[in-house]
């Protein structure tokens, strides 16, 4: 078989278990010689066999590249059940595994991302917004994986990319319509993060990840609720024993958990701090995205899906603040009609029964009530949750994701209401430019 070694073609005749066997075979050939095994070589074989077709070795300096040829303008290569445009490189880091890299035009790459991050059947404007976000992310992230020989990975660690398998005429059209366009802030490529759904409000990046990003500012989302969102609301239940195990196995220094509650909300109503208490009286407070990630457990198959949730079964005071503002505590004024013909001057001290049947006492704060005209919220500040003697904590929330940047279901809802992709991007990202 033919081999391309260090810039020249050679012919190889066989593989041997030892150098002496190779040297004996070489003596039977005019000009033959034995070559040691290389840890940077790449061998091409017939699929499913050991029959060698070609070998390549450039000491790891240049990888093997394969450019497919075929009929039509866009030859397609199959790899592990997926179809890809463009060429492939097969670098091998010295002593390491072989990498498979798809070398593809930027627009073809975006066409391979869109239908895996958003349904290819969604409204065109939503797909166009997603295309601009995906393109911006790729351009901004290029070369951050360069030590491995590629620009971006193909998983959720970067953006899901699986070639052309899931592409639709509409998703491809969205990419073509926005070709070359990216999101900029102050002349620089923006970090166009996105999530599935915000549950009613996005959030400041500072309140989720700790660093303020001027164009990643939270806001109430009046559009998302109009979309039909699967599993928009979620409920997850933990026992004290489960929470203790989850926290301790995640490396947190805490004893047997006896209480957990939201200790601070952001002004937009998303969770900013959660406090855990143990049987020794010690407390642990986490903030930002850790508020939901602290509950994550593959062992129990449980997680908190968004930054927008409440906890029942614990007891504690919650303030409204966040990283971008000081805590505030206010109470509602006036009187409240109860039981038809009675009034209360204050809700402090009022007895209530929770949705789970637990009896408790209010000490003021943000309270949802059912009136003749619907559900309303009164007060804003100190909230005391009802203690659950059974030791079970119930987390109820809306949305799915980190709540920062564009809501994908919100983009869908805006598109369905007639907004274009620029409207969508300008709503979810503050003071940006699209060009």
Regions found by a protein language model. Give the residues of each.
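Conserved, single-site charged/polar hotspot
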Residues: 1-435
């Amino acid at each position: 078989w033919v081999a391309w070694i260090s810039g020249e073609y050679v012919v190889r005749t066989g593989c041997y278990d030892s150098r002496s066997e190779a040297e004996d075979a070489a003596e039977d050939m005019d000009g033959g010689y034995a070559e040691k095994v290389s840890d940077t070589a790449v061998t091409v074989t017939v699929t499913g066999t050991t029959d060698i077709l070609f070998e390549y070795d450039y000491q790891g300096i240049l990888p093997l590249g394969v450019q497919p040829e075929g009929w039509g303008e866009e030859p397609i290569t199959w790899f592990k059940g997926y179809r890809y445009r463009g060429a492939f490189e097969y670098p091998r880091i010295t002593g390491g595994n072989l990498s498979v890299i798809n070398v593809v035009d930027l627009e073809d790459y975006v066409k391979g991302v869109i239908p895996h991050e958003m349904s290819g059947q969604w409204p065109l404007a939503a797909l166009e917004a997603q295309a601009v976000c995906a393109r911006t992310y790729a351009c901004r992230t290029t070369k951050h994986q360069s030590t491995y020989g590629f620009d971006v990975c193909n998983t959720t660690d970067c953006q899901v990319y699986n070639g052309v398998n899931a592409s639709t005429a509409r998703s491809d059209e969205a990419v073509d319509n926005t070709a070359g366009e990216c999101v900029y802030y102050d002349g620089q490529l923006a970090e166009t993060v996105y999530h599935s759904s915000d549950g009613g409000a996005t959030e400041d990046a500072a309140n989720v990840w700790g660093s303020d990003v001027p164009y990643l500012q939270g806001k109430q989302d009046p559009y998302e609720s109009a979309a039909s969102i699967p599993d928009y609301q979620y409920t997850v239940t933990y026992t004290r024993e489960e929470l203790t195990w989850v926290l301790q196995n995640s490396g947190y220094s805490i004893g047997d958990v006896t209480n957990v509650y939201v200790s601070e909300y952001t002004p937009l109503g998303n969770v900013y701090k959660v406090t855990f208490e143990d049987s020794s009286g010690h407390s642990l407070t986490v903030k930002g995205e850790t508020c939901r990630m602290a509950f994550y457990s593959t062992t129990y198959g449980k997680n908190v899906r968004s930054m927008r949730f409440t906890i029942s079964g614990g007891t504690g005071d919650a303030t409204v603040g966040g990283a971008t503002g000081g805590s505030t505590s206010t109470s509602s004024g006036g009187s409240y009609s109860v039981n038809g013909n009675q009034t209360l001057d204050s809700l402090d001290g009022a007895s209530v029964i929770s949705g789970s049947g637990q009896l408790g006492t209010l000490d003021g704060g943000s309270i949802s009530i059912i009136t003749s005209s619907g559900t309303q919220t009164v007060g804003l500040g100190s909230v005391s949750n009802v203690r659950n003697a059974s030791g079970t904590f119930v987390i109820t929330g809306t949305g799915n994701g980190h709540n920062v940047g564009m809501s994908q279901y919100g983009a869908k809802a805006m598109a369905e209401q007639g907004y274009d992709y620029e409207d969508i991007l300008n709503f979810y990202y503050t003071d940006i430019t699209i060009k």
